[in-house]
């Protein structure tokens, strides 16, 4: 809907407030031909970005960060209305976004090749942009996850085609207005950045398949990620997908700290986080104590209006999502799971649920993407390790222990892209490498690592000089 520096404004798609279920905006839904046009515009302008020197890319990114910083309250409120995230969590997302743009700016000046030793030739490498980056983003972090794609893309001199989730595109529209303003002030062709709103089956599908997209960065479900992987036509891809992330609690750990961490990280954004705790695996000697503390902490949580400062959990993104979670809880119970607290649904709201399950239960196998905290018993640390690794996913894992030898054992043997010791798998810093193995994804995010992914290395050999 923002293509070649122009806004395409229609009322094709109703966007609902997840909490009130009222229409907050009617936006443009691009068709396939319009999406192709956006990609063509980015292709025509990729040399504009390539020719921007690192200092100008740095300035561009820093100015975007400055403008967001000057509109913190606007962006935080927009996130909360857009996706139902509690306002105190939305403010954290805005701060992280500012940091991510500033990190991207710093790495714009850090693109370096190397010199290759040779007796008779001069051989060196140089970093060049891939050309056009397609960014497909989910609803759950509608500002920061966009930044993790477009920040490195701009830093490396690429043109961008952004497609935000059709469930929550309003934050992306506000961000695009900031980028439009900065590009205009810096006299940079606005066709270097294009926003494509609409249905993923059309817009996202075209971005994934179009051969003029040189690099595709996607965050979303495993099912869609697998389809993209099969249809990406040899383009470079980074897929940040889902998981069932284990949190392991050994008997020698600080049980109170582990319980508080499990509850806080599981119910962040109502469990709609790709690195949310999928299950807690607890050594049986401390299972009762841990479970009791988890229930105590869960009872303290406030469910309600995301704009209320007291709210800890807001709604899920749609009533259908809440219904899916409710059905998943019932399925778990039918398989022998014991519901200890919560699980009550009203429209898009669902109260935080804690269940006791065994390792064959559905909640031990799937990504719930909702406020469900399953707890499993392990006979010993080896059993806990086996349960954790018995998964098709491999995004992040957490382990609580006060034994450094056990910490290192789990760090080495857990089959996950990241292992967090004495913390939950939900931990993430914007400058650390982030990405899973197995069905949880391909490639790495994190500003520095995304910058590396969005470059090509060119080798230059000079003879007879």
Curated annotation (Swiss-Prot):
It catalyses: (S)-lactaldehyde + NAD(+) + H2O = (S)-lactate + NADH + 2 H(+). This is Lactaldehyde dehydrogenase. It comes from the Archaea. Pathway: Cofactor biosynthesis; coenzyme F420 biosynthesis. Belongs to the aldehyde dehydrogenase family. Signal peptide: none annotated. NCBIfam families: lactal_redase_Meth (NF040648). Disulfide bonds: none annotated. PANTHER family: ALDEHYDE DEHYDROGENASE. The lineage of its organism: Archaea, Methanobacteriati, Methanobacteriota, Methanomada group, Methanococci. Involved in F420 biosynthesis through the oxidation of lactaldehyde to lactate.
């Amino acid at each position: 809907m923002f293509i070649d520096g122009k806004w395409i404004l229609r009322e094709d798609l109703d966007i609902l407030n997840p909490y009130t279920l009222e229409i907050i905006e009617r936006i443009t839904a691009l068709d396939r031909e319009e999406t192709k046009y956006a990609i063509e515009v980015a292709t025509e302008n990729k040399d504009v970005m390539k020719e921007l020197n690192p200092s100008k890319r740095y300035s561009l990114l820093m100015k975007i960060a400055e403008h967001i910083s000057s509109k913190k309250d606007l962006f935080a409120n927009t996130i909360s209305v857009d996706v139902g995230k509690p306002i105190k969590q939305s403010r954290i997302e805005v701060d992280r976004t500012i940091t991510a743009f500033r990190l991207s700016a710093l790495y714009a000046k850090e693109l370096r090749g190397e010199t290759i030793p040779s007796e008779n030739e001069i051989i060196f490498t140089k970093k060049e942009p891939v050309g056009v980056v397609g960014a497909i983003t989910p609803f759950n972090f509608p500002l920061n996850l966009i930044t993790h794609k477009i920040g490195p893309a701009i830093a490396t001199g690429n043109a961008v085609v952004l497609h935000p989730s059709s469930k929550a595109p309003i934050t992306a529209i506000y961000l695009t207005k900031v980028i439009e303003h900065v590009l205009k002030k810096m006299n940079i062709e606005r066709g270097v950045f294009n926003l494509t709103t609409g249905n993923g089956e059309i817009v996202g599908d075209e971005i994934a398949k179009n051969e003029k997209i040189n690099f595709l960065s996607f965050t979303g479900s495993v099912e869609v990620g697998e389809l993209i992987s099969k249809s990406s036509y040899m383009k470079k891809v980074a897929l940040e997908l889902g998981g069932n992330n284990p949190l392991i609690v050994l008997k020698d750990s600080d049980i109170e700290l582990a319980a508080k961490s499990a509850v806080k990280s599981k119910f962040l954004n109502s469990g709609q986080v790709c690195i949310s705790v999928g299950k807690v695996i607890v050594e049986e000697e401390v299972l009762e104590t841990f479970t009791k503390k988890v229930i105590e902490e869960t009872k303290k949580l406030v469910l309600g209006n995301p704009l209320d400062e007291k709210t800890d959990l807001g709604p899920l993104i749609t009533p259908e999502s809440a219904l899916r979670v409710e059905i998943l809880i019932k399925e778990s119970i039918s398989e022998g799971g014991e519901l200890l607290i919560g699980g009550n649904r009203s429209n898009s709201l669902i109260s935080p649920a804690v269940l006791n399950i065994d390792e064959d239960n559905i909640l031990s196998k799937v990504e719930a993407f909702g406020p469900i905290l399953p707890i499993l018993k392990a006979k010993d640390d080896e059993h806990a390790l086996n349960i954790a690794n018995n998964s098709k996913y491999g995004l992040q894992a957490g382990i609580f222990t006060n034994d450094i030898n056990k910490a290192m054992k789990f760090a080495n043997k857990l089959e996950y892209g990241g292992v967090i010791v004495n913390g939950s798998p939900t931990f993430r810093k914007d400058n650390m490498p982030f990405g899973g193995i197995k069905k949880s994804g391909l490639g790495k995010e994190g500003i520095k690592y995304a910058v590396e992914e969005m470059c090509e290395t060119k080798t230059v050999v000079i003879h007879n000089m």
